[in-house]
Curated annotation (Swiss-Prot):
Binding-site list for dTTP: 232-234, 249, 262, 269-270
Ranges that cross the membrane: none
Protein name: Ribonucleoside-diphosphate reductase large subunit
Keywords tagged on the record: Allosteric enzyme, ATP-binding, Deoxyribonucleotide synthesis, Disulfide bond, Nucleotide-binding, Oxidoreductase
Domain ATP-cone as annotated: residue spans: 7-98
Marked site positions, Important for electron transfer: 743-744
Oligomeric and partner information: Heterodimer of a large and a small subunit.
Disulphide bridges, residue numbers: 224-450
Organism per entry: Caenorhabditis elegans
Amino acid sequence: MQRYNSTYVVKRDGRKEDVHFDKITSRIQKLSYGLNMDFVDPVAVAIKVISGLYKGVTTVELDNLAAETAASMTTQHPEYALLAARIAVSNLHKKTNKVFSEVMKTLHEFHHPHTGKHAPMISDETWAIIEKNADKLNSAIVYDRDYSYTYFGFKTLERSYLLKINKEIVERPQQMLMRVSIGIHGDDITSAIETYNLMSERYMTHASPTLFNSGTCRPQMSSCFLLTMSEDSILGIYDTLKQCALISKSAGGIGLNVHKIRATGSVIAGTNGTSNGLIPMLRVYNNTARYVDQGGNKRPGAFAIYLEPWHADIFEFVSLRKNTGPEEERARDLFLALWIPDLFMKRVEKDQEWSLMCPCECPGLDDCWGEEFEALYAKYEAEGRVRKTVKARKLWEHIVSNQIETGLPYITYKDAANRKSNQQNLGTIKCSNLCTEIIEYSAPDEIAVCNLASIALNRYVTPEKKFDFVKLAEVTKVITRNLNKIIDVNYYPVEEARNSNMRHRPIGLGVQGLADCFMLMRYPFTSAEARDLNKRIFETIYYAALEASCELAELNGPYSTYEGSPVSKGQLQFDMWGVTPTDQCDWATLRKKIAKHGIRNSLLMAPMPTASTAQILGNNESIEPYTSNIYSRRVLSGDFQIVNPHMLKDLVERGLWTDEMKNRLIANNGSIQNIDGIPSDIKELYRTVWEISQKDIIEMAADRGAYIDQSQSLNIHMAKPSYAGITSMHFYGWKKGLKTGMYYLRTKPAVNAVQFTVDKNALKTNQQAETPATVAESQDEGCLMCSG
């Protein structure tokens, strides 16, 4: 019998081999190419790996340990995250087939392990195209690009995005991107490879449902679905519930308005009984959201429920997420949202009375907006059809106190959403979506749908610190064409969704990495230069998307309900805001083209949260500033340490990055504002969201809003929330004309989770111990459905 020393590894083929420190070190060194070796130490990683070994460890487990070890050293230098990812990617590459077409064949030929039935994981159509074009597609893939992901990004891909057989990943990231591209473009191989390259080089990404499902047997690639309750009856309520379940099963996020459901105590004509109102019904929806988890626990189901503040059950509705109170009055898995008419805000401002009504007794309030709504509401008040009269500020205080406790409800403005919508010719828009960036018309026979993608703005900053608007416009046009194609090839879980999407053809372009873009340009987030760039970026995207949509209309005709829309009358989004665009784009020529050909898509712009896809690409989310410069983040795939890589690079170049500096940063909860020795220009550039005026954030949202024909997921951050402060922010946003006043209210925890391993008293001396983790505000993971 062969003897082994006390520690051996088990190779992939089952052979046993003695552990060799030099071999481990050599492998880590090979994967450290191009990294800053003044700060990345392969030997230090290898020493830690050796100390964690046990007898019989497999080489796969050894690689996982090495990757996690490198990831744990990210707070020393951000390039450890790249090294960690390279080790993990190398491990995956060893386990998977490098030939794209062969991997797709394996996925197509998959048989159910228990029944033996053919259960293909990619569609017959997708496989036929790949088989026919195998050589061209195989040679187009650049596997080295897998090594450009950060560890955090790669682990996110592993957890939810790469296809698995019997729980084993068989797909590489580059193969996933090519599958997605073929699923969108079919046999248009040139366009598929173009899309693959743009995603692979991280200029843009399609939304999570598209990455999950493109090319599969059920290619449900849409992110957002907006529903109106079909009718106020048992049949209507449960029909709508079934629709929500089918959509959620297919990875769609849901926005549902319940304005028309009668209030508590209303008479039920058929049985001569009385209604239990909204709350018991919403608890049923809550349980459905918990039960339907989008297949294999990829993501929990998520429903946002919208209600107008005149509804007689409004006080109970707003309290649904409270941590205390009777369980039968709570629905903590629903996301609550208010659809607020201007009249309510005016009455709060003037400290006037507010009347609560039942939609059964006061019909039509949800079917109109603006002056028509105000006239009907006043008519019902005059006729005495009111259930209850309260001070408007009493309800407002109730809303704000719940926001302080739970971060909800979302605030969306009904009149701004309708007044500035290109879909206003369809009827009254009654709600937004799960993440408050989609503003689309829905009806009992129409479920609004939106397909999303986001542009990684950091990629458009040149080495000379110039912003490449030409490339931005070029990529925007590709995305617009892609999203338009998805409308046609998409699988629709319910027919009402197909009906709506085919008629109106809305799409949603968003961004990620705006904060990274500003940092690369050396612009503090709210500086004059950043504000100007913010406007020009969104003007460019809107212009390019309109131009691409017009070119599609020239080929295929405008969308079915184009006539009568504001754009058909020459009214573009910035016209509705009363804003004059810059001279950067040739708007006069584009207006003439649109007047002649129309546009193919009713809506184009919708900056979404990008929670998951920004993690994959290593960017800060969406339009948000950084929340901290150093923190741990808990997501589905585990706990990861995140360091602001731009700041680290600056501190390293100036010789300021030391263990002591790292621990000062942790002790200051990710802020550098009070750390001595850091130059003022660095402090200004790396202000966290807690150190930026929220008034400035709202102003920048309004600036870009003139070019956003849907809306934007706008969070409000307040370290110490107060009634006065939140009220001030809401009224400022409303008066600025925002459609979405607030997505979440983000607050700091009462006690900051500073790691106990950091001894504040020892900060003046050299630190001896490695700090294993970092600090951050505690927040939910964010919406993954809308992650564009």
